[in-house]
Amino acid sequence: MKHKIIWNAIERLAKDNNLPCSGLAKLSGLDATTFNKSKQFFADGTPRWPSCSTISKIIAATNISIEHFAEICAQEKQKLSIENTIGQ
């Protein structure tokens, strides 16, 4: 699993629910800035991964299963693979 895939899946889940990422965060009981691009990496450039608790909250808030979230991740992985192939 790649960092970018998880974050893309979260952004996709927000979009699929007609929400900005801040709206998904609020719906999930999280701070509105939780999914800001600026929070996807630490100051030193190290990737910041969303916690299991955060993922659990967005799954519950959007009423999907963990399997559905995994499917979204798989679709985002495929998109990323295609983008990388085209970019070569």
Residue ranges and their predicted role:
Residues 43-60:
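Short, basic-rich loop-to-helix N-cap that marks the start of a DNA-contacting helix
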Residues 60, 67-88:
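Short, charged recognition helix plus adjacent turn
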